[in-house]
Amino acid sequence: MKKTKFFLLGLAALAMTACNKDNEAEPIVETDATVSFIIKAGSPQRETEPNSLLDSDAKITKLTAMVYAGQVQEGIKTVEDADNVLKVEGIKCKSGANKVLVVVANYDKNAGGDAIDFTGKTLDQVKAMTIQLTQDNQSAKFLIMTGESNAFTIKPGTNYYGYPAGTGTTQDNLIETGNALKVTRVHAAMSIQNVTVTFDPQYSSNYYFKPQNVAGLICKKQSKIFGASLDFGTDYLGGVATTAAAYTPTSYDNSVSWLTKPYAAKAGFYIMESVYQVGNNLRPTILCVYGKLKKTETQDFSQEELDAAVAAGYCDGNAITYYPVLVNYNGYGYTYTGENTGLNKILRNNHYKISLTVKGPGTNTPEGPLPEEANLNVNCEVVSWNVVNQSAIWN
């Protein structure tokens, strides 16, 4: 009977724990204070088009906050809310100077990370964590965000970080009044806003192209989640296998089905921060529009015409032609509007929006350097997200 009673009590305790979405681990130091904070991450917005990436993919459903004194984690609390987490309240911690608040949002195994318990981790251990680019984090639900405060002082009692003036009582400690802690996305985004096909006269009577698919090529596989630069490793992913060329990485999985999709305006992908440095085997990220090159809208090439197009480098043996855009690359035919543009790198929290004008046949080696005069114009912009509008013309 006693065993049954204890078993039922245990079940009741488990049920109560399962319903509690504010999970606070026991601090590893004696506590005499609590910290509450609010965050600033932009307005949540849902995708309304199946292929589109929106500028305001900022919804937070899970937020872990940690208080550090040097390397020691003095407090930790996780809050989950399907409708959006904007604050964490009552983190138990110890008073003192030079405290740092570190937050990680939307971090779990579905977001490309491990199912990690942050409890007891040193500051260096948290900052050393990495994530992978996965199919799951092509959903805005799993866009990881991170933030870190400057050093501040916690006083005994109740502390509020980033709250407006007048919060709490006169005995409470207001820190960074009105300046909510900023969190930013670890991912970047790239999308094709539109493709305009207007073949020049020397091509228009012999070639026809209509966009069919969009693919991400040479996309970084891993990323740090903290640091001035998040670029990590030399492993890459791609959505379609093409003939290897100068930019093709040594460590490359180019058969990733979710990095290709049917062409539509605003189609794109969430990607990782990356840097282009040839000497260090670091390659440029490419957003590629491709499809069948034909003689006319209703007529395929004859075998002789196909052979000639392949020999010219316009398409592969299946008549597929590619229009690659090196994202945020400082190259011929690329123009930009906005900030952080033409840097030969992909930066976190930037959305690279590409407009493409096609004036002639593409290439059969999209992972190779573009000719000095290619049939491509690219235009790009930057806001926050930060949006980079890039325009390219393929001549």
From Swiss-Prot:
Residues 385-394 are annotated as: Important for oligomerization and fimbrium assembly. A lipid is attached at residue 19 (N-palmitoyl cysteine). Keywords: Cell adhesion, Cell outer membrane, Fimbrium, Lipoprotein, Membrane, Palmitate, Signal, Virulence. One of its GO terms (molecular function) is structural molecule activity. Gene3D superfamilies: 2.60.40.3690. Residues 1-18 form the signal peptide. Residues 19-40 form a propeptide. Its main location: other. Synthesized as palmitoylated lipoprotein precursor. Efficient export to the outer membrane and integration into fimbriae requires lipidation and subsequent proteolytic removal of the lipidated propeptide. This is Major fimbrium subunit FimA type-5. It comes from Porphyromonas gingivalis. The gene is fimA.
